[in-house]
């Protein structure tokens, strides 16, 4: 079985072909952009959802739905670069970075969880899966997945870790080999990454692409904050959140970004329509 399920090779435009030859790695083709989205209605939606279901919905869960919709709505960006060519993915999955604390040193580390087809998932189920998965990662109980492979890499000497990561990326993505037999999870990062820098108290920051993951999109969500807005000629205070995007220009360009922005704006413009009206969970009764 292959490492990732591919739908076939993408047909390249002249620019895309030139871009593949211009940038050799994910270190230099990064392009950046930010978007401010309104949050007043979204915060009301989160409050209503929590009241109706009891599930602790957060902005991160909604971003899972949004990014799933982005990958589904702009399939050209749901792609992976391998052997100098762009291949489209069959599956839709989003990776969320999770901050964890090393129990021995107390230092902060990064791991994460992968969510499949989040745009099609029921929000309550999505929240529960997040809570379960992130809890396992933070307790370092994910010994069959990404956390296990991360621990294994600690045995690699520092002088060889760069070469090792490049080799694993080549085998996993370049040659599309399933290395699960060696403890490397299949396609652990999906087609996009999201990291919540707002939880760290940051209003915003651009984060780098992760070269060995071959993921062409990483979104950083900033803190929800008050901002002055002009509405009907009057200055009003509204809740907003900024999204900071880093793209791999070998796969994504401005035309793709415009389509993605339209989807993101649509989701946050009317969250009750985009994410579904909150409904109380049915109460189980004994027959």
Residues covered by each model-derived region:
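C-terminal catalytic/motor cores of large multi-domain enzyme assemblies
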Residues: 1-287
